[in-house]
């Protein structure tokens, strides 16, 4: 990320502000809050699933590597073949991910243990995740979103610049699952974006996230379907992008730029 600093100082400086942990609201903020302490019933609801061990509200992008490394959900693997989670869990955490996918192949990247790639995935979410380094155009750097569009008969390369201001976020801020033994990252959008559409998709595939330890019931746990909800809501219907509110334009010294301190819009209300 640091290589972009000299050419894009304003964007870089505001991006570093995602390290801040100084804002809270009723709808989260940038402070890690222990949700299991707030809502201990969730430990029972998630019995048998990794989230019953640890679940905190998210912090900013600069904490991505730190937080996934510290969470109890990824365990403490001692070797490259140890640990409870696949390397798929790295997918949205670093611009090192596309580099490794190109180096070893997408299938090999997913079909590995999380601990196996820890010495390669070291830079937090940053510039190259959303921008083409050669020209800084917005681009899609993760295959799962492209593949989800293809299964719906859509060509993501035809997206408008305004649509791209949301699609770069849709690489990660979505519902997803790890498909098959290869733990292949997949978005369940084939039938649509609604809860009912995704439930029908999962039912047809026979997929569930875990078997509840107490009731022995197969359970689906939604992840973070931010993009889907936005697209079905008034914002998506009116053509408002994620960046319009979460990365508003600013002016400094006569220069207009997008604020890369990606955060809750509630923190920016004058």
Model regions and ranges:
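Primarily the internal scaffold of c-type cytochrome electron-transfer domains
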Residues: 1-59, 102-124, 128-129, 133-244, ...
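Short, thiol/selenol-centered motifs that function as redox-active sites or metal-ligating centers
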Residues: 89-92, 242
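Long, mid-chain structured domain cores
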Residues: 71-81, 96-109
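Short loop/turn segments at strand-loop or loop-helix junctions that form parts
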Residues: 93-94, 132
């Amino acid at each position: 990320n640091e290589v972009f600093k000299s050419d894009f100082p304003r964007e870089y400086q505001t991006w570093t502000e995602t390290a801040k942990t100084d804002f809270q609201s009723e709808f989260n903020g940038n402070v890690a809050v222990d949700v299991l302490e707030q809502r201990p019933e969730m430990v029972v609801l998630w019995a048998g699933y990794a989230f019953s061990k640890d679940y905190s509200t998210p912090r900013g992008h600069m904490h991505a590597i730190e937080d996934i490394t510290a969470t109890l959900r990824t365990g403490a693997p001692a070797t490259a073949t140890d640990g409870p989670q696949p390397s798929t869990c790295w997918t949205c955490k670093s611009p090192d991910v596309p580099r490794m996918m190109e180096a070893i192949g997408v299938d090999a990247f997913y079909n590995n243990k999380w601990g196996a790639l820890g010495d390669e995935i070291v830079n937090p979410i940053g510039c190259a995740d959303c921008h083409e380094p050669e020209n800084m155009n917005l681009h899609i750097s993760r295959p799962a979103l492209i593949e989800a569009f293809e299964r719906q008969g859509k060509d993501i390369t035809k997206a408008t610049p305004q649509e791209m201001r949301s699609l770069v976020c849709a690489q990660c801020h979505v519902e997803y699952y790890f498909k098959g033994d290869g733990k292949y990252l997949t978005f369940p959008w084939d039938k649509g974006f609604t809860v009912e559409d995704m439930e029908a998709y999962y039912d047809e595939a026979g997929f569930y996230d875990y078997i509840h330890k107490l009731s022995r019931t197969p359970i689906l746990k939604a992840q973070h379907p931010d993009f889907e909800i936005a697209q079905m809501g008034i914002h998506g219907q009116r053509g408002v992008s994620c960046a319009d509110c979460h990365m508003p334009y600013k002016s400094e010294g006569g220069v207009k730029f997008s604020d890369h301190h990606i955060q809750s819009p509630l923190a920016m209300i004058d």
